[in-house]
């Protein structure tokens, strides 16, 4: 097996390399979400609107690259410096080295709190929080305990005419319906629009079945 290699998805290109925890640097099941919000962004941009997107727990930038390719300005936030560096590589591979992407190495919740104080707003928010983790000073992140508060805070960063909100989870203890309920509570009830949630999966060619790969809940304006 090579140490690293590139793959393509449409006009996007990504660097893959084996990492710990059986990761390769990309979650291909997220392509269904990339296509979804890229269409929303593209429609808005074609109508003459500028679109700002916040990508939290942004990892190696699959969603960042997809959103930027669709025409959005993106703020990419992840606490791991190495992941942010690989996100820059992925943007360059996709011809987006000069795209309006801000790369931030920071704790995502603390960044959101600062953005609230600064009064910044975003038209779309993407988040892919980990199931469990520890911050730089030992604070514990457990998605079942913390995701409600994070979505509540992040929802206050939505603009007056928001386009979408997406949350992904790979935690069995956080069901799609639970994520949808939280989105409805903090986003749909305030902004109107439509919410939906479902498992996401990868097709298995040998069996013609589907391999479950987590879940997504997403909201979009009508």
Language model feature labels by segment:
Residues 49-59:
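Conserved class I S-adenosyl-L-methionine
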Residues 1-28, 35:
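Non-catalytic substrate-recognition/targeting regions of SAM-dependent transferases
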Residues 80-126:
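S-adenosyl-L-methionine
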Residues 153, 158-165:
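Short glycine-dipeptide loop
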Residues 60-72:
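Conserved SAM-binding loop of SAM-dependent methyltransferases across substrates and taxa
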């Amino acid at each position: 097996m090579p140490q690293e290699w590139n793959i393509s998805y449409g006009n996007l290109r990504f660097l893959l390399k084996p990492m710990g925890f059986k990761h390769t640097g990309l979650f291909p099941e997220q392509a269904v979400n990339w296509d979804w919000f890229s269409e929303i962004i593209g429609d808005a941009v074609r109508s003459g609107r500028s679109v700002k997107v916040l990508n939290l727990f942004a990892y190696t930038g699959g969603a960042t690259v997809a959103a930027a390719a669709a025409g959005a300005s993106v703020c990419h936030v992840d606490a791991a410096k190495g992941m942010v560096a690989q996100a820059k590589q992925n943007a360059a591979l996709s011809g987006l080295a000069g795209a309006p992407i801000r790369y931030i190495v920071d704790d995502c919740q603390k960044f959101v709190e600062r953005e609230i104080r600064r009064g910044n707003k975003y038209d779309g928010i993407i988040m892919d929080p980990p199931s469990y983790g520890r911050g730089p000073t030992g604070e514990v992140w457990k998605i079942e305990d913390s995701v409600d508060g994070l979505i509540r805070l992040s929802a206050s960063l939505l603009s007056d005419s928001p386009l979408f909100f997406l949350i992904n989870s790979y935690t069995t203890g956080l069901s799609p319906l639970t994520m949808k309920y939280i989105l409805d509570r903090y986003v749909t009830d305030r902004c109107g629009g439509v919410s939906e949630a479902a498992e996401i999966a990868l097709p298995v060619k040998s069996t013609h079945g589907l391999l479950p790969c987590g879940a997504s809940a997403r909201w979009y304006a009508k």
